[in-house]
Amino acid sequence: MNQREHPRLVGPFEARWRGASGGGTCLIGDISLGGCFVNSAAIPNVGERTSVSLELGGEELLLPMGTVVTAEWGLGFAVEFKALGNAELADLKDLIGRLRQRRRTA
């Protein structure tokens, strides 16, 4: 049984991450209104504030700032989005909708 509060959209989606400990290219393994899982060889520290951006239709789109809640070397890390404002939440819903639509037409 899936205990997640928000349904996930499974990737992969090409992206980049940036945080205090570094950054790099990555793949978003899945994304939801609650956060995302980032597949990356390099990982930030648990508790670190991290930004993730992806390209969609030639446009770079920035996900809300999140906090790394788990990290595993060689696999990646989970970012949680918390306390999003109405505008951030609306933008994230729009982005997930666009990714879902792109998946259907691919």
Q: What kind of region is each of these model predictions?
A:
Residues 37-40, 74-83:
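Short, solvent-exposed secondary-structure boundary/capping segments
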Residues 30-32, 42-44, 56, 68, ...:
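A short beta-strand motif that forms part of the nucleic acid-binding face
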Residues 1-31, 41, 93-106:
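N-terminal helix initiation/capping motif
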Residues 20, 33, 71-76:
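Short, conserved beta-turn/loop elements at beta-strand boundaries and strand-helix junctions
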Residues 48, 54-55, 89-101:
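Extended Gly/Ser/Thr-rich low-complexity repeat segments
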Residues 26-27, 63-69:
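Short beta-strand-centered aromatic/proline hotspots
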Residues 13-18, 47-61:
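Short conserved beta-strand and strand-loop elements enriched in small hydrophobics
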Residues 22-24, 59-60, 75:
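Short acidic/polar mixed-charge low-complexity motifs
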